[in-house]
Amino acid sequence: MSPIPMRSLVRGFKPYTAGLSIDEIREKYGIERVIKLASNENPLGTSPLVQHTLETHVGLAFRYPQAGNPRLVKAIAAHHGVSPSRVIVGDGSDEVIDLLFRICVEPGVNNAVAFMPCFGIYTTQAALCGVELRQTPVNADFSFPWDNLLKLVDDKTSLVFVTTPDNPSGYTPPVAELETLAKALPDTCLLVLDEAYMDFTDDEADYSLAKRLDEFPNVIISRTFSKSFGMAGLRLGYAIVPEELADHYWRVRLPFSVNLMAEEAGIAALQDVAFHDETVRV
């Protein structure tokens, strides 16, 4: 048989390394009782309202979800006080990040920038898309060396990723530093603030630009339902982006990538404020 046709960069590609599931741990180490903390899953499980919603809608699993998930988009927009035209959703925030690379960065021309270490999806998807990802190490105390980051940025930089709160350190830069960074970037560069853990901060306004996006047209806020909402297994993420980018996102996103169960669960999760708040308190 002739060699299977394959892009050269895929041969020897280093995949994302996920944490082991409980079943894998039991099988590998021969133990029954496993307390899993490695993947930052919600210790309270899944919202009772989300569970009820899934039970109610499981009979509709034969249906395709509505294109563009407009009910979910509207619920997320209301949650953040933004226009639905700025909200995009994906099969986990992984899909959102992947499509940002595919939409915003021209392979061989543009580049992206991030700190090191960073969320593994940045490196895998940059590599898969043939995009140069420039990185600089965080400081010894895990704080962010902004000057070093900005030295990597040039007129060909399309995306700058900052994870805040950072994982695994938990370091969270004050909002004033994010303001300075956003203003220092070229007009042609987008600042992606990956806020998967932002719900766990004491006062979001001290650390996030999510409520001030009208002041910063080059800022994207990315979030997930996996952590504080306890829905990691359903794969649901979203971002608040400039309207023009949202329009192009919906053009290229795979149809129905957010399934009907995840959509209904996401809407319910936003309604169960008590569960969310108890998760944050714990």
Positions of predicted regions on the chain:
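N-terminal "arm"/small-domain region of PLP-dependent enzymes with the aminotransferase-like
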Residues: M1-R63
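Short acidic capping loops at alpha-helix termini that bridge into adjacent secondary structure
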Residues: R33, S83-V87, G108-N111, K156, ...
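PLP-dependent aminotransferase class I/II
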Residues: G68, N218-V282
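PLP-dependent aminotransferase-like
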Residues: I103-V162
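Active-site pre-lysine segment of PLP-dependent enzymes
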Residues: A127, F144-K156, P168-L191, E195-S228
